[in-house]
Design a protein with these regions (language model features):
Chain A
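A short hydrophobic beta-strand segment most commonly corresponding to one strand
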Residues: 144-163
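Short hydrophobic/aromatic-rich beta-strand segments that constitute the beta-sheet cores
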Residues: 88-90, 151
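Short acidic-glycine-tyrosine-enriched beta hairpin
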Residues: 93-136
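Conserved short histidine dyad/triad with adjacent acidic residue
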Residues: 58-75, 92-96
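His/acidic/aromatic-lined binding-pocket segments of jelly-roll/cupin-type domains
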Residues: 69-71, 76-81, 122, 130
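Tight coil/turn sites that cap or link beta-strands
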Residues: 62-66, 126-127, 133-135, 145
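A short, N-terminal "cap"/entry segment at the start of jelly-roll beta-barrel domains
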Residues: 1-60, 67-69, 166-169
Length: 169, 346
């Protein structure tokens, strides 16, 4: 048996086709339907726009453009590169509890360059997923124009919710 | 995890079975009787003193049964079709027929019964083992496994049924965690994803941090999945689980979650048929393309249709308190309440 479509279709900032909702007896808002490329196209660099929320857990979309601030968290986070190329610097914080104590969840922006040992560098392209280990400071650097990141984390002080702007209604 | 099938024979006396003229065993769980023939699975039960029966294609039934077993009854309801299914009550499993079908329910012809999860698991594994013929893989796309599900009983396919669900502790490829998929560990690139780049991230870890600085090619990992509609876990943030999967043809069940779950379409397109959880009444059709994100409310059942193999990220909140909080109405079934007036930012 053969199939005509042999090309895998991924999205990008330059090429995405948003789907939609055919309502039969429902309200589109129930589905909080958005598109990460569309959200990133309208966002500020590294603005942490919430596109998925399950109680305190969130998925955030980030527009990767230039170099981000340093962030850390008291728990593991992960990031998927949906478009572009990104480098991630990691630093093992000398005193992670001071910046992100265990009872504080979500990504915390560092007010000053991280103090600690350099852990390494990761160079990611589209489709790559990286661990952002708890207690480590990290920053993103887009190396090929503007990229799109999807962050698995917990709602924090820098999370931005604007459901009415980003979702089908 | 499906587990080893070597011990199922010892359990058969708990759900007595006999072989029919097609060579297949018949199973009884409480008042439910299950049998199959060359084409069909038949489910029988009693209600209001009457014997009721329901017939499904054996192909459809086995695909659904495979997911129910592999997912350990998953979250909430696994509807094999509009009539029969299971509800996970965590340590207990409810089997039902007609319970969530408005006509059976209205006529009082529905039936449900709860069993220990381990008992149902053993029974379902035994059923899968007996009813899956050699060459048939209920996890594979129809184009890959063909019509070997048909006909009289012929052998087994235990290798296919014994796959373990891949759930990482932190991320695949980390020391002590689930391995990455490669040709060497018998995960060739699927025929539909031959064009997916296989390059791995460049990792430059400082000495002493080799086990913490970690990334992998998620799309390549998915391109090597040998199953459809069977999420694995690739990252964990407390109860937040990223469960990507590859999908082709039709989700063999109508899943009704006992909590909100989310989908992020990573590639290609899936169409979701959305129905009311309790009645099956149509509510919406959701078309998701690469980059689309959507919530599946906690009061619906959904079934996906993927015309070519696609990559989907299923996002689950595995907090065990959630089913009761939704059941009690403490949590709303959707995020509609989060919407503010246009332009406002929370």
């Amino acid at each position: 048996m053969s199939f005509t479509d042999t090309k895998t279709v991924f999205g990008s900032l330059d090429s995405y086709v948003k789907g939609g909702i055919e309502v039969i007896d429902d309200d589109r808002r129930h589905y909080a339907f958005s598109n990460v490329f569309e959200v990133a196209s309208l966002a500020k660099p590294y603005e942490k726009v919430v596109v998925g929320k399950n109680l305190r857990y969130v998925i955030e979309t980030l527009r990767a453009e230039g170099t981000s601030d340093w962030f850390t968290a008291s728990h593991d986070e992960s990031v998927i590169v949906m478009d572009g190329s990104v480098e991630i610097d990691l630093v093992k914080l000398d005193d992670p509890e001071r910046i992100a104590p265990a009872h504080i969840e979500g990504s915390i922006r560092l007010e000053a360059p991280p103090q600690g040992r350099r852990m390494g560098l990761m160079k990611l392209r589209r489709g790559h997923q990286a661990l952002l280990p708890k207690g480590a400071a990290y920053r993103f650097r887009s190396t090929d124009g503007v990229g799109v990141l999807v962050l698995q984390t917990i709602h924090g002080p820098h999370s931005v919710e604007k459901w009415s702007e980003i979702c089908l209604t | 995890m499906v587990g080893d099938l070597s011990d199922v024979r010892a359990m058969e006396q708990d759900f007595p079975s006999t072989r029919n003229e097609s060579g297949y065993q018949r199973f009884r769980l409480g008042d439910f009787v299950f049998s199959r023939d060359e084409y069909f699975v038949h489910i029988e039960w009693r209600a209001q003193g009457k014997k009721l029966s329901h017939t499904m294609s054996a192909d459809v039934f086995l695909r659904a049964l495979m997911r129910d077993v592999a997912w350990n009854f998953f979250y909430g309801w696994v509807n094999f079709d509009d009539v029969f299914g299971t509800r996970n009550r965590y340590d207990r499993v409810e089997l039902y027929a007609g319970r969530y079908h408005p006509v059976y329910k209205e006529q009082g012809l529905d039936h449900s019964a709860c069993f220990d999860s381990s008992f149902v698991m053993q029974a379902f594994r035994s059923m899968l083992d007996d009813w899956t013929n050699v060459g048939y893989d209920p996890f594979a796309a129809p184009a890959e496994t063909g019509l070997t599900w048909q006909g009289k009983k012929q052998g087994h396919n235990r290798a296919a049924l014994n796959r373990a669900r891949e759930s990482c502790r932190r991320m695949p490829g980390l020391p002590g965690d689930v391995p990455l998929r490669t040709d060497r560990n018998r995960y060739p690139i699927n025929r539909a994803f031959l064009d997916v780049p296989q390059d791995e991230p460049v990792i430059e870890a400082e000495p002493g941090f080799e086990h913490e600085v970690h990334a992998f090619n998620l799309f390549a990992y998915l391109s090597r999945s040998d199953v459809t509609w069977n999420p694995s876990v690739t990252s964990v943030c407390k109860h937040s689980l990223f469960c990507p999967t590859t999908e082709e043809y039709i989700l063999p069940v109508k899943h009704a979650n006992d909590r909100i779950e989310w989908f992020l379409q990573l590639s290609d397109q899936i169409e979701w048929r959305i129905e009311d959880r309790a009645t099956g009444r149509p509510r919406a059709s959701v078309v998701m393309r690469a980059g689309d994100v959507a919530a599946m409310p906690a009061d619906i059942r959904h079934q996906g249709f993927s015309r070519r193999r696609s990559m989907l990220l299923v996002w689950e909140n595995a907090d065990p308190r959630l089913p009761q909080l939704y059941e009690d109405g403490i949590l709303p079934p959707s995020l509609a309440g989060e919407f503010q007036e246009p332009g406002s930012v929370k």
